Swiss-Prot record:
Deleted gene: phenotype: No BsuMI restriction or methylation-related phenotype.
Species, as recorded: Bacillus subtilis (strain 168)
Designated name of the protein: Uncharacterized protein YdiN
Domain of life: Bacteria
Induction section of the entry: Encoded in an operon with groES, groEL, ydiM, ydiO and ydiP. This operon is heat-inducible.
Keywords associated with the record: Signal
Signal sequence, renumbered to the chain: 1-26
């Protein structure tokens, strides 16, 4: 299970322009609904969010290396 602070770190690293308080709260609700999901589910949700909010200049390779740094 990834700790939420690690996920926040990954998001900050990849998406510095959109990490506002509201975005973080929305991500928290999506990643952790009532029950804590499995690692795979967290990763899948996070990956979808990264793709959705990804700024054109950031490539998937950079996101992957960023995630590798925190895992």
């Amino acid at each position: 299970m990834i700790k939420f602070s690690v996920i926040l770190g990954m998001i900050r690293c990849s998406l510095t322009h959109i990490t506002t308080k509201n975005t973080v709260n929305a991500l928290k609700r999506m990643i952790y609904p009532k029950q804590k999901p499995s690692f795979f589910h967290e990763f899948k949700v996070l990956y979808k969010l990264l793709k959705k909010f990804c700024i054109k200049g950031i490539m998937i390779k950079n996101i992957r290396s960023c995630m590798g740094y925190f895992l």
